[in-house]
Every structure is written in C-alpha cells, then in structure tokens.
C-alpha cells in the first residue's frame, strides 16, 4: 500500500491538475472560436468573462474561504469548474462556459493560497511553499497550454472529457489535505462594505500595498500579452496551429519555473523591495518584444519574460500572505488580491480588445502594455522610497 502524501504535497498535485485544466480550456475555447468563425476579438472577450467573475465575486469568496475548511472550499471550486466543462460539452457559448470556469477559479483561489500559512510553521517555510506552489502552477500553465493546443487540434469533445476527468482527479487529492475548522462566526452581511475595509487595511500597510500593486501589474502584463501574442504569432511569424502556438508559449512557462525556483535564494520577505529590479527587466522585455521578427528570438524573449516574472511575483505573493494572515485573514487577503489582480487584467484585456476592434496594430498594443507597466513600476518606486520615512511596516 502506498503511503499517504502530506497535505502540502497533496495541495501541490491538486493545484497542478486544476490549473492544468484551467489553461487547457483556454486553448479549447480558442479552437471552438476558430472552428465557429467567431470575430477576431472573441478570445479576448472569453478571457474577459473569466476575469470578470473574479471581480464581481471577490467580496464574498474570501469570507467563504475563511468560514469553511479550506480543503473543502478547494473541492467546491473544482466542482463549479467542472460545471463549466459540462457547458462547453453542451455547446454553450464559449464566453459563458469559461465564465463559469472563472467562478470556480475565484472560489478556489483564496483557499489554495490561504491554506499555506496553516500548513507551514515559519516565514521561510511559507516562502518556500509559495515558490513550490507557484512553480507547480506555472508548470501546469505550460503543460495545460501545450495539452490544450494538442488535444483540441484532434478532438474538441475528447479534450473536454479529459478536462472533466482531471478536475475529478484534483478533487481526489483535495480530499487528502488536512482540514482546518474555519471560522463559523464569519457571515456575509455587509460583505461589500467589509471588503472595502479589507482593501483599505491592506493598502495602509506598506508591504501589502506594494505587493498588491506589484502582483496586479504582473498579471495585467501577463493576461494582455497572452491574448496579444495569440494574434501576433500568425501575423508576424505566420504560425497558426494551436499545437505550435502552445509550444511557443511553453518558453514562458519554463522561464517562470526557473525564475520561481531561484527566487528564495535571491529575495526574502524582508528584502521584497528587490522585486522592483525584476519588474523593470520585465517591462523592458515587453517593450523590446515589438522589435522581434524571428522565431528563435521570440522563444528566447518569452523565456526571459517568464524568468523575470517568476522572480517578480513569488516574493510579492509571500509578502502579501504574511501580512494578510496577521491582519484580516488569509482567505480575505487572497480575495482582495484576486480583486486587484483581475481588475488590472480586465482593464488590460479590455483596452486590448477595444484597440483591436478599432484596427490598432498588435505591436502598438504590446508597446502600450509595456508602457502601462513602466507607469505602474514608477508608482511602486515612489512607494518604496516613501516607505523608508513614513509608511508602517509589519514584521
């Protein structure tokens, strides 16, 4: 008989499987859009509905994650995602189907990060667990993108059946995670007002303010570039197959894994301000992307983007969880983080969608994304400088 895996290892595997399918489904949606002759902007719309789910549900899901055992909340999130797969199988509109997957993801997310402080016993362990979880997530993004592209090129229905089975496997690993008791005293009355207070609390603490802006900027760039590069590859390099596109995207995933894995040796929770340098590298790489016209350079640039992104995002996540666990609660902290990040992403993808509809070239949209990132990093530099003299910090 095989030994039972630890709660942390079970979480890593469950997260890998769930994130694998989340990203697999985006490529399946792309195949459905291509096959159904939807408008050119429709993939961005599908991505936007996923993000919008996070924005509208954020005031409630953090409380839900803190009220109930987080391992159980992970199961609930996967079940809702499975419902989204069923809608895809029933040939519902891909935007609606992926929006339901987004609802499952918004329920799942506060629990997956919020449970980490309960499964670790020190700041070092928390940062290490964060790094591992981020690495598993990134590998899942990489593998799910390749798997989704490969399978959807062969059979959309077959790919969706596999997706449903993998969500089921993730639930089985969720069952192996030890359960906390949750806080049954938490209620949902005045959730929006309380959520606004939670945002204000985290914004008043220098580390969490800086981390929220930083993670938001990362995901704005990531989400916008993802849909932009989908359009850029056929136009600039003449690559159209889902399998080929997903393999090129794999370079970013490999870079993210590399960056996330080396981060604990470069940046700690105490030295989180060093992330600004990784952010600057990320912005410069995005701006430079508009001057690329060959496949080898594209792959190298995507790898470098991923590596800079991994070094940038992991310490920011760990710092935010460290502060949130000691203040408003882990689940509510992740809900605030999701709200900020997905608002940033929704705005970025929204601007891109409007610009494509207006006939603005893809390269101009990518350059605009890099410019937005530079503006946000300038604000973060101001936050970092101001913190030396005024804003309170939490040890």
Features from the language model and the residues they span:
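Juxtamembrane intracellular "pre-TM" segments in multi-pass secondary transporters
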Residues: 1-9, 179-213
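Substrate-agnostic recognition of the 12-TM MFS/MFS-like secondary transporter fold
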Residues: 9-26, 49-65, 69-80, 97-152, ...
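A single, central transmembrane helix in multi-pass transporters
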Residues: 24-28, 156-161, 200-258, 311
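Transmembrane alpha-helix termini and helix-breaking/packing motifs in multi-pass membrane transporters
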Residues: 27-37, 87-91, 138, 142-163, ...
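Transmembrane alpha-helices of Major Facilitator/SLC transporters
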Residues: 56, 247-268, 344
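Structural signature of the two symmetry-related core transmembrane helices
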Residues: 72-87, 164, 273-289, 367-370
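Hydrophobic alpha-helical transmembrane segments
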Residues: 95-98, 102, 128-180, 250, ...
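Helix-loop junctions on the cytosolic side of multi-pass membrane transporters
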Residues: 114, 118-119, 160-190, 381-392
């Amino acid at each position: 008989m095989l030994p039972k895996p630890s709660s942390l290892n079970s979480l890593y595997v469950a997260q890998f499987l769930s994130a694998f399918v989340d990203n697999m489904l985006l490529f399946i949606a792309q195949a459905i859009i291509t096959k159904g002759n939807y408008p050119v902007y429709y993939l961005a719309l599908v991505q936007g509905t996923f993000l919008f789910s996070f924005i509208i549900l954020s005031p409630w899901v953090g409380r839900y994650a803190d009220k109930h055992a987080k391992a159980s909340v992970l199961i609930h999130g996967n079940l809702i995602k499975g419902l989204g797969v069923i809608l895809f199988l029933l040939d519902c509109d891909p935007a609606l189907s992926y929006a339901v997957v987004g609802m499952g993801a918004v329920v799942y997310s506060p629990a997956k990060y919020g449970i980490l402080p309960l499964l670790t016993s020190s700041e070092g362990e928390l940062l290490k667990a964060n790094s591992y979880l981020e690495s598993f997530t990134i590998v899942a993004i990489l593998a799910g993108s390749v798997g989704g592209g490969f399978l959807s090129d062969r059979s959309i229905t077959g790919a969706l059946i596999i997706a449903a089975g993998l969500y089921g496997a993730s639930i089985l690993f969720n069952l192996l995670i030890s359960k906390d008791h949750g806080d049954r005293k938490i209620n949902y009355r005045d959730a929006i007002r309380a959520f606004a207070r939670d945002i204000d609390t985290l914004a008043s603490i220098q580390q969490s303010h800086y981390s929220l802006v930083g993670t938001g900027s990362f995901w704005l760039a990531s989400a916008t570039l993802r849909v932009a590069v989908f359009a850029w590859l056929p136009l600039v390099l003449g690559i159209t197959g889902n399998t080929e596109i997903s393999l090129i995207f794999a370079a970013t995933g490999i870079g993210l894994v590399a960056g996330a894995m080396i981060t604990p040796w470069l940046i700690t929770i105490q030295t989180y301000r060093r992330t600004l340098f990784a952010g600057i590298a990320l912005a410069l790489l995005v701006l430079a992307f508009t001057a690329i016209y060959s496949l080898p350079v594209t792959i190298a640039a995507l790898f470098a983007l991923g590596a800079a992104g991994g070094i940038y995002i992991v310490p920011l996540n760990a710092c935010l969880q460290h502060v949130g666990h000691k203040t408003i609660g882990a689940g509510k902290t992740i809900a605030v983080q999701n709200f900020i990040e997905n608002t940033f992403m929704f705005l970025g993808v929204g601007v891109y969608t409007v610009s494509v509809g207006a006939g603005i070239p893809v390269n101009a949209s990518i350059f605009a994304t890099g410019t937005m990132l530079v503006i946000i990093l300038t604000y973060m530099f101001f936050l970092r400088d101001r913190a030396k003299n005024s804003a309170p910090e939490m040890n």
